[in-house]
């Protein structure tokens, strides 16, 4: 799915739930969040008997747990019938496309266009630190943002100069 399609889905979800907090969105949508010791796995999504579950490694700090929740919410929203843990472990199918889409979803959910554009002079690391997200998430957001010049051109930050 294109970044613009993911952006539209995220905007609708934020409008519907009134928040960009992935934990609150899950609560509003009836998605259960479970914290477990998952070893090296950060998290995963499971659909079981019409119930949706997001499992998050209980060893993660709040910042990482929030990102993992946003990423897994991306799977819930974009790939509700695909069990990527099953695909990875049992079938060795290539899941890179699904993972990239879930990362783009998380970036769109947790980082606004304004967050990037108003801090464009700063390094990726500085923006990540300021927003309390990973550097990779900032890179995903920037990739999607700069792929659509209209988002930049129409932003008030650039029109005021």
Q: Across the structure, where does each feature detected by a protein language model lie?
A:
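Active-site hotspot residues in diverse enzymes, especially metal/ion-binding acidic/histidine motifs
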Residues: 1-161
């Amino acid at each position: 799915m294109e970044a613009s399609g993911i952006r539209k889905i995220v905007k609708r979800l934020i409008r519907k739930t009134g928040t960009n907090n992935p934990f609150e969105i899950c609560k509003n949508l009836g998605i259960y969040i479970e914290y477990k010791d998952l070893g090296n796995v950060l998290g995963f999504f499971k659909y079981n008997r019409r119930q949706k579950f997001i499992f998050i490694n209980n060893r993660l700090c709040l910042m990482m747990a929030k990102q993992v929740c946003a990423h897994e919410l991306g799977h819930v929203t974009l790939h509700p019938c695909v069990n990527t843990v099953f695909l990875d472990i049992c079938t060795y199918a290539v899941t890179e496309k699904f993972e990239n889409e879930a990362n783009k979803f998380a970036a769109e959910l947790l980082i606004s266009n304004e967050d990037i554009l108003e801090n464009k002079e700063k390094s990726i690391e500085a923006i990540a630190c300021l927003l309390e997200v990973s550097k990779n998430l900032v890179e995903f957001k920037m990739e999607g943002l700069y792929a659509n010049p209209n988002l930049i051109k129409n932003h008030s930050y650039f029109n005021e100069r």
